[in-house]
Amino acid sequence: AAVPEAAAEATAEAAPVSEF
């Protein structure tokens, strides 16, 4: 399921910095 950019940003803020 593709999540909108807004949700991705919110998830990035809440989740730890691991994607970078």
Curated annotation (Swiss-Prot):
Any one Gene Ontology cellular component term annotated for this protein: extracellular region
Alphabetized UniProt keyword annotations: Secreted
Main location: secreted
Location of the region described as Disordered in the Swiss-Prot/TrEMBL record: 1-20
Tissue expression summary: Detected in the hemolymph.
Localization per record: Secreted
Keyword Secreted tagged: yes
Subunit description: Homopentamer. Forms a cylindrical structure with a central pore.
Protein name per the record: Haemoporin
